[in-house]
């Protein structure tokens, strides 16, 4: 009788441990628009890679859950979160008061702002020096808005491109005098393509932006897991290693 009871108790305990482990390892569906290197993009094998991807993988490992990344177009990414098709969205999403009304955000995981990229030999040292110069920007971005504020919305000196790398390539070939773009994209491009040829200018007039990981409004349990993992990877140096891998400093 005692042996049977012991066996039953052991089996129940093992089952309880298995269930607890299974709950801790729950897999969440993650929406990301894989068209914004170095944060998220697809490699030659069509795998989703990038800074955001590595950060969330590390957060998941510390937070006790798993993630599955799904390439999700930007125009529908927040709807997929709200209707339950995605549990998490990480896609270089700036935390704004408007977005906080319809979704919840983790603590910030990335500080972003605009940077000016110029050739090393350029005499440009601040935003004001760009008056009368040709500025390359990616269409419809914050960099585009900054150039419009400086030169005027219809200025012929604003040269628009489909992507930031194309704008920087035009800078390298001498077609524009400077590029205004997101700091993460600019730093990554220079680290991989423009070392010793380009430099950046951090103008005080550019406001800081903060990226956050989004979850459905009211999902406090998941948000707590994410914030727990984020705090852990910042504390143990994992975040810094990932940051250095993608941004070089």
Where are these regions (language model features)?
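Extracytoplasmic small-molecule ligand-binding "clamshell" domains
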Residues: 25-92, 236
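Extended ligand-binding regions for polar small-molecule ligands
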Residues: 53-62, 128, 134, 141, ...
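Sec/Tat signal peptide C-region and signal peptidase I cleavage site
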Residues: 18-24
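A ligand-binding cleft/hinge motif common to bilobed small-molecule-binding domains
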Residues: 91-101, 146-149, 172, 177-207
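Bacterial N-terminal signal peptides that target proteins for export
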Residues: 1-9
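Flexible hinge/capping segments at coil-to-helix
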Residues: 118-135
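Periplasmic-binding protein-like
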Residues: 34, 111-118, 187, 191-227, ...
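Ligand-binding cleft/hinge of the Venus flytrap
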Residues: 42, 56-65, 143-161, 190-195, ...
């Amino acid at each position: 009788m005692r042996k049977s009871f012991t066996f039953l108790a052991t089996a129940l305990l093992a089952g309880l441990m298995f269930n607890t482990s299974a709950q801790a390892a729950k897999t969440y569906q993650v929406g990301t628009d894989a068209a914004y290197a170095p944060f998220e993009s697809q490699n030659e094998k069509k795998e989703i890679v990038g800074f955001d991807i590595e950060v969330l993988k590390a957060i998941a490992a510390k937070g006790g859950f798993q993630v599955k990344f799904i390439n999700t177009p930007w125009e529908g990414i927040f709807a997929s979160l709200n209707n339950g098709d995605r549990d998490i969205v990480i896609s270089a999403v700036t935390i704004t008061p408007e977005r906080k009304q319809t979704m919840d955000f983790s603590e910030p995981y990335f500080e972003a702002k605009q940077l000016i990229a110029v050739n090393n030999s350029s005499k440009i040292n601040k935003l004001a020096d760009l008056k009368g110069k040709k500025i390359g920007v990616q269409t419809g971005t914050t960099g585009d808005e900054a150039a419009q504020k400086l030169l005027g919305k219809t200025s012929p000196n604003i040269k628009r491109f489909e992507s930031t790398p194309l704008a920087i390539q035009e800078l390298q070939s001498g077609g524009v005098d400077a590029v205004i773009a997101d700091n993460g994209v600019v730093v990554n491009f220079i680290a991989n393509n423009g070392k010793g040829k380009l430099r950046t200018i951090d103008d005080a007039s550019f406001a800081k932006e903060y990226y956050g990981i989004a979850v459905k409004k009211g999902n406090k349990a998941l948000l707590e897991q994410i914030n727990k993992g984020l705090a852990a990877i910042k504390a143990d140096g994992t975040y810094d290693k990932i940051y250095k891998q993608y941004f070089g400093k």
